[in-house]
UniProtKB/Swiss-Prot annotation:
Transforms N(2)-succinylglutamate into succinate and glutamate. It catalyses: N-succinyl-L-glutamate + H2O = L-glutamate + succinate. This is Succinylglutamate desuccinylase. Pfam families: AstE_AspA_cat, AstE_AspA_hybrid. Binds 1 zinc ion per subunit. Belongs to the AspA/AstE family. Succinylglutamate desuccinylase subfamily. InterPro entries: AspA/AstE_fam, AstE_AspA_cat, Aste_AspA_hybrid_dom, SuccinylGlu_desuccinylase. It is an enzyme of class 3 (hydrolase). Keywords: Arginine metabolism, Hydrolase, Metal-binding, Zinc. Coiled coil: none annotated. SUPFAM superfamilies: Zn-dependent exopeptidases (SSF53187).
Amino acid sequence: MLQALLDSKDFLALTLANPETLGDEFSFTLGEHTRVEVWNTGVIVFEPAQAQGKDVILSCGVHGNETAPIELCNTLIKQLLQQKIIAKQRTLFLIGNPLAINNGTRIIDENMNRLFSGEHSNPPGLVNPERVRAKKLEAYVDRFFKGAAAGRQRIHYDLHTAMRASKHEKFAIYPYRPGRAYSAEQIMFLAASGVDTVLFHHEPTTTFSYFSSEQYGADAFTIELGKVYPMGQNDMTRFIAAQEMFMRLITDKPLALEPFSADKVNLYQVCRVINKHFDDFEFTFAADVENFRSFPKGFVLAREGGQEIKVEQEFEAIVFPNAKVPIGNRTVICLIPSVAPDVR
């Protein structure tokens, strides 16, 4: 395994050729500046000899068909392995769901991004590949963040692409963080990365980014970088800004961020989540409606069990509508413009 990686510098290829395990961990050094550790398939750590003050996690492929972030991360990994760039911050890359990537599908059995914060082990337990992998990913995050002295800034960007078109092509979900202000620096970092829209979540969830935020105090985000396309069919020029900013972060180059200003970004507050309670749940709008489409108060969004679900606020925008989820799961997130969020 070691020699294959040293020869190819292609960690994604190694991961997809061994989607369940790489066997024993292995490590090696790049020059005299970086120790590289491979903990398992899809799990690679870059430990600078003289690390600066940030611990950075870039995760991708939690959903197997969201390929642009996978290609983006593999490019950064390849540049690090080729020593075209040199890590100055401790950095962990996670390729989340290799089995689903090989399968060309979003999932194998279950949506992995609903299985963190221990949800993987709640009934029915570790019964499928996503649940088993989610538990392992939590352990890798724990090991990484606890592998350095306390007091360092912890960052986790969980990278995705969306299944549908969007009014705002790139957007981020800021996990619920009661008692903690939102980071102005992080919001402007996202903006510099081309991610000009942020959704503030209103309650705990079982997503990967919420896990890192809540358990480790990380500046963590679920970041949607565009639309789903098959591997190799992404227009990677659309991700130049994101790749550049991630590279600058990892290599400790100046970020040159603008001061925070609410008029430079689109800020939304999650006002509610609509879950599915009956098999006959259906939306009233077209199946191809774009993310952030707005509807007026009183508009019937959906019907189920003989009841109508209406827009409650003056206007509500929607993201991630999906009527085909299992009963009990989220069908859509409803948003309102965010007014004076606590950003510092």
